Each structure stands twice: as C-alpha cells, then as structure tokens.
C-alpha cells in the first residue's frame, strides 16, 4: 500500500531537499527519474530501486518492527553506537580513506 513520490515538479517546484537523501540512497538514474517525472512509485519499485529494504503487509508491520527493535536492542549498545557512527562517517570519505578509517574503528 505504501507509495513514494517527489511531486514538486508537478506543481512547478523542484524537490531539492528530498533530492539530497534520495540521491544518496538510489542510483542517479532512479533519483532523476523520480525527481523529473514526479510520478508515484509503489513499494515493489521502491524496493527494486533500493529505497526500501523490505515490504511488509500492513497487518504484520508492528510485529516486524518490534522484532527488529528487539533484535537490535539485544546487541551491545556500544557496538551499535560505534557501528552507526562509523557507517555514516565512512560514507562521506574517499574509498581509501574509508578503509583506513574503518580499520581503526
């Protein structure tokens, strides 16, 4: 049932702010398709684009989210914190720098 869209172009605007996150999570071609057409995509297409990682039927959503939360909460909070910080830090680095950085984490 979920749909995704960057509709600004449909009303004479460009979705500049959503473009930042979109362009960092899907291919350039897919981002431009969404940004330039303003068309709505369904969950299956969003998954194909890499915008989402899983499609869950509405009736199971709370159960699935709860399971993810429990699984993550069962891990070391320090490891999760360190891992998240490293993930986002290395994403902005050149490849060689990212490997050097993560080798020290």
Enumerate the language-model features and the residues they cover.
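Acidic, divalent-metal-coordinating active-site segment for phosphoryl/phosphodiester hydrolysis
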Residues: 38-45
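Short loop/turn segments at beta->alpha junctions
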Residues: 27, 42, 57-60
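CoA-thioester-processing core
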Residues: 1-34, 49, 64, 68
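C-terminal long alpha-helix characteristic of the crotonase
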Residues: 2, 52-104
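Terminal peptide-recognition signature
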Residues: 22, 46, 83
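Generic anion/oxyanion-binding catalytic loop in active/binding sites
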Residues: 11, 20, 35-36, 54, ...
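Structured beta->alpha junctions
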Residues: 35-38, 72
């Amino acid at each position: 049932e979920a749909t995704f869209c960057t509709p600004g172009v449909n009303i004479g605007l460009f979705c500049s702010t959503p473009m930042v996150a979109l362009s960092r999570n899907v291919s350039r071609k897919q981002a431009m398709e969404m940004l330039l057409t303003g068309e709505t995509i369904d969950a299956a297409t969003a998954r194909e684009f890499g915008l989402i990682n899983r499609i869950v039927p509405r009736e199971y959503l709370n159960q699935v989210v709860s399971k993810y939360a429990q699984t993550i909460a069962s891990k070391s909070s320090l490891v999760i914190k360190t891992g998240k910080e490293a993930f986002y830090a290395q994403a902005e680095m050149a490849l060689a720098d990212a490997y050097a950085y993560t080798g020290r984490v």
